[in-house]
Amino acid sequence: MHKLISTEQAMMDRYVTLKNVKTGTIDYCFDRSDFPEDKYPGFYFMEIGGQYECKIVLFGSLASEEGPNTVRCRVLDPDVMIGNCRFVKVGVGEDVYYVYHFRVKDGLANGRFLFRCPRKDLIQVDDVVLSEFYKYEGLWE
């Protein structure tokens, strides 16, 4: 469960600041849901101070050593579908995130990997999934 702390409008999208109510972790996330469609509403229903079940994807790539923006991930579930896209559910400390499967498939063998994460993206709020994950069958496998 996350609490929406703030939003910041950018040119064609926005950033949201979320606080994990269980762990206290603050996540600054990119929100690309600015083009809602009838079938796929965006995340603009979120209100400051409201609490929501959020899924956040770590955007980046496998890392061979620790460095800036690098996190230690432990695999919680190696195969999760969100919309039509395949993800790996990971734990970073006590927090749960998602990583595109195709970006880490070579690092899943021992159940842990380093991941360089310069950005976090909000991909699901409650039952609303970012529309692009339904539009393209098989994308990001």
Report residues per predicted region.
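Beta-strand/loop nucleic-acid-binding surfaces
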Residues: 24-46, 91-124, 131-134
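Structural detector for short beta-strands of small beta-barrel domains
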Residues: 1-12, 65-91, 113-115, 141
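A generic structural signal for short, solvent-exposed coil/turn residues
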Residues: 8-10, 20, 46, 82, ...
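OB-fold/S1-family single-stranded nucleic acid-binding modules
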Residues: 55-79, 116-141
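Compositionally biased, intrinsically disordered low-complexity regions enriched in proline and serine
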Residues: 16, 53, 88, 98-101
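Short, acidic/hydrophobic/Gly-rich beta-strand patch recurrent on exposed beta strands
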Residues: 17-21, 87-93
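Acidic (E/D-rich), amphipathic helical modules within compact regulatory domains
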Residues: 15-70
